[in-house]
Curated annotation (Swiss-Prot):
Lineage of producing organism: Bacteria, Pseudomonadati, Pseudomonadota, Alphaproteobacteria, Hyphomicrobiales
Region (Sigma-70 factor domain-3): 529-605
Bias kind Basic and acidic residues: ranges: 1-18, 117-128, 214-228
Protein name as annotated: RNA polymerase sigma factor RpoD
Subunit structure: Interacts transiently with the RNA polymerase catalytic core.
Family as reported in the entry's similarity comment: Belongs to the sigma-70 factor family. RpoD/SigA subfamily.
Compartments where found: Cytoplasm
InterPro entries to which the protein is assigned, alphabetical: RNA_pol_sigma-70_dom, RNA_pol_sigma70, RNA_pol_sigma70_r1_2, RNA_pol_sigma70_r2, RNA_pol_sigma70_r3, RNA_pol_sigma70_r4, RNA_pol_sigma_70_non-ess, RNA_pol_sigma_70_r1_1
Region entry Sigma-70 factor domain-4, spans: 618-671
Main location: cytoplasm
Organism of derivation: Rhizobium meliloti (strain 1021)
Residue ranges with Acidic residues bias: 83-102, 250-261
GO function term, MF aspect, one: DNA binding
Source domain of life: Bacteria
Motif (Interaction with polymerase core subunit RpoC): 474-477
């Protein structure tokens, strides 16, 4: 049968390739093997094709015939295993980067096939922007249905993780602590729950149930139309950011509308606090009932008497479902959820370390890994486990139990302490950790897909903010951070497309980063908003009066204090580098023309040097003792002056004698023959 298939394949090749004598030698075993493998896969790579092509000169007709023959056989010729992704990326980037894809094959040797398709990809790998764009282009855009599907996966993963956390007693212990902290005023409500999601959650979730599809579609179109208008307005005001290097702002009217429509965080807290406290009280009461059943379950495992009765199991499930429903209604802050997950993972890590120590000890005595796991699984808290393994007939069990008796007991005691800390059995704890990990993994994968599919949106927005103090890749990075926040907060039930929602977050992240990082001297965001407002008003008045407005006119127009306007205009100026070239030849810098207030002027330096020299000559005309006394008393040529007592100690005489020597020396200096030389310095 295999021989017949091979003969059919060769017949196909001979029938399709015979007319012009194609490049492939069909009698060659390597060619036959390559074609057979290519038919199974549906493609052949350039490297594989080049390895079987002849090395002599060939015509373009032969190359075209070979490519056509392979195509007719259902075999695609690709560059490499990842060529399809690269091709998709090249299609997206080709217009921007001026690349020519799929050009005509030139007459050459067999390697010419690869040369025509491998031109650009290897040349542009050094440019990180092009590499990023190429990889980004390999991801397909999402449709509206695709966005909803991924959003549902994110929601399902998060709910799985929350459900796992709700089965852990540690979660409810933390919730009770947070409730007490709220009552005592030690923490804010916004630190425990997501205020915006909790405040708008019920209305948002109810929308699909109580609104018709036509109404939802109409609202969505109205929102998109409003977004287009807002983008147009923002584009008209984009130049404001260029002038001040700050954050782009929408028109003032829109800002005022947003302020009116959004409640403050304090108002949200005041409105939600009673409801949240009531929910936390319900959780605390329900958990007390559940805790009793969990304690009974752990005691049953420790006593090796089995599990709960069927009635207790049903009651346990009912209480657990009530708690899960109550916790979901809270919309916990993501930071709090992360803290709960981290707590679970930390205990799981300690449990794994102890069990790993126990396994390694057993293996050191020749116990098989599979045998150990078979005996250990399900008996983590069994008090009779030591007795049972010491009676096993398998290799190493008796030696292991006898030699490491105390170590085994210590490790199992630590494991039992972990079970007591978690409030549930080890098997149940492992199941909860696995459930949380599964939900977190599913949500993370779905979020990654949503982010990667919308990277083009970040590029399109970041292009508008170039040349404003940050490099293009930095803008993309900040925009991607905003995109990830948008994915975390996206609510598909509202009926809007993700791009409509994400645009605000991306623009906000980019403009905030420009405000924080673009300027050498950082200006607060609220001050940048004031600068933008003044710049817009100044441009408007320029069109009205035909000249730049004065600070007084701006203050009157904006109803702002004159001093504040002047202060803002002064702040808006960009710092200039002292290394800025000056002149056409650029051989001097701006710093060369700035006066140094601390530097000594040349004339003053000359006068000081002349005074020092003249004083030295005049003092040299006195006796050595008189000269030294004057120098020490007045600090001439020394670090500091000296008192009469200090000078007297140097010469081993009294203070009075030093005073007399000083007075005599000063009288000598007042003589016209000496004073005449120093008098000229008084005028200077």
């Amino acid at each position: 049968m295999a021989t017949k298939v091979k003969e059919n394949e060769e017949a196909d090749v001979e029938r399709e390739g015979a007319p012009d004598g194609p490049l492939l030698d069909l009698s060659d075993d390597a060619v036959k093997k390559m074609i057979k493998a290519a038919k199974k896969r549906g493609y052949v790579t350039m490297d594989e094709l080049n390895s079987v092509l002849p090395s002599e000169e060939v015509t373009s007709e032969q190359i075209e015939d070979t490519m056509s023959m392979l195509s007719d056989m259902g075999i695609n010729v690709i560059e490499d295993e990842e060529a399809e992704e690269a091709a998709a990326s090249d299609d997206d980037d080709g217009a921007d980067e001026g690349e020519s894809e799929g050009g005509e094959l030139a007459p050459a040797s067999g390697t010419a096939l690869a040369a025509s398709k491998k031109k650009e990809p290897t040349d542009r790998t050094d440019d990180p922007v092009r590499m990023y764009l190429r990889e980004m282009g390999s991801v397909e855009l999402l449709s509206r249905e695709g966005e909803i599907a991924i959003a549902k996966r994110i929601e399902a993963g998060r709910e799985t993780m929350i459900a796992g956390l709700c089965e852990s007693p540690l979660t409810f212990q933390a919730l009770i602590i947070w409730r007490d902290e709220l009552n005592e005023g030690q923490t804010l409500l916004r630190e425990i729950i997501d205020l915006e999601t909790t405040y708008s959650g019920p209305e948002a979730k109810a929308a699909p149930q109580f609104q018709s599809p036509e109404k939802i579609e109409a609202d969505r179109k109205a929102a998109e139309e409003k977004e287009k208008v807002r983008r147009t307005r923002t584009a008209a005001n984009d130049d404001d950011i260029t002038n001040v290097g700050g954050e782009g702002q929408a028109p003032e009217e829109e800002e005022e509308d947003d302020d009116e429509s959004n409640l403050s965080l304090a108002a949200m807290e005041a409105e939600l606090r009673p409801q949240v406290m009531e929910t936390l009280d319900v959780i605390a009461e329900t958990y007390k009932k559940l805790r009793k059943l969990q304690d009974q379950q752990v005691e049953a495992r420790l006593a090796a008497t089995g599990t709960l009765s069927p009635a207790q199991e049903r009651r346990y499930k009912e209480l657990k479902d009530e708690l899960i429903k109550a916790v979901k209604s809270l919309s916990l802050n993501q930071n709090r959820i992360d803290a709960l997950v981290e707590q679970l993972y930390d205990i799981s890590k300690r449990l794994t370390q102890n069990e790993g120590r126990l396994l390694r000890l057993a293996e050191s005595y020749g116990v098989k890994r599979e045998a150990f796991l078979e005996q250990y699984s399900g008996a983590e808290l069994d008090p009779n486990w030591m007795k049972s393994i010491s009676n096993l007939a398998g290799k190493g069990w008796k030696e292991f139990a006898r030699a490491e008796n105390q170590t085994i007991r210590d490790i199992r005691q630590e494991i039992q302490n972990l079970a007591t800390e978690t409030g549930i059995s080890i098997a149940e704890f492992r199941r909860i950790v696995s459930m949380v990990q599964k939900g977190e993994r599913e949500a993370r994968i779905a979020k990654k897909e949503m982010v990667e599919a919308n990277l083009r949106l970040v590029i399109s927005i970041a292009k508008k903010y170039t040349n404003r103090g940050l490099q293009f890749l930095d803008l993309i990075q900040e925009g991607n951070i905003g995109l990830m926040k948008a994915v975390d907060k996206f609510e598909y039930r509202r009926g809007y497309k993700f791009s409509t929602y994400a645009t605000w977050w991306i623009r906000q992240a980019i403009t905030r980063s420009i405000a924080d990082q673009a300027r050498t001297i950082r200006i607060p965001v609220h001050m940048i908003e004031t600068i933008n407002k003044i710049v817009r008003t100044s441009r408007q008045m320029l069109h009205e009066i035909g000249r730049e407005p004065t600070p007084e006119e701006l203050a009157e127009k904006l109803a702002m204090p004159l001093e504040k306007v002047r202060k803002v205009l002064k702040i808006a100026k960009e710092p200039i580098s002292l290394e800025t070239p000056v002149g056409d030849e650029e051989d001097s810098h701006l710093g060369d023309f700035i006066e140094d207030k601390n530097a000594l002027l040349p004339i003053d330096a000359a006068i000081q040097a002349n005074l020092r020299e003249t004083t030295t000559r005049v003092l040299a005309s006195l006796t050595p003792r008189e000269e030294r006394v004057l120098r020490m008393r007045f600090g001439i040529g020394m670090n500091t002056d000296h008192t009469l007592e200090e000078v007297g100690q140097q010469f081993s005489v009294t203070r009075e004698r030093i005073r007399q020597i000083e007075a005599k020396a000063l009288r000598k200096l007042k003589h016209p023959s000496r004073s005449r030389k120093l008098r000229s310095f008084l005028d200077s």
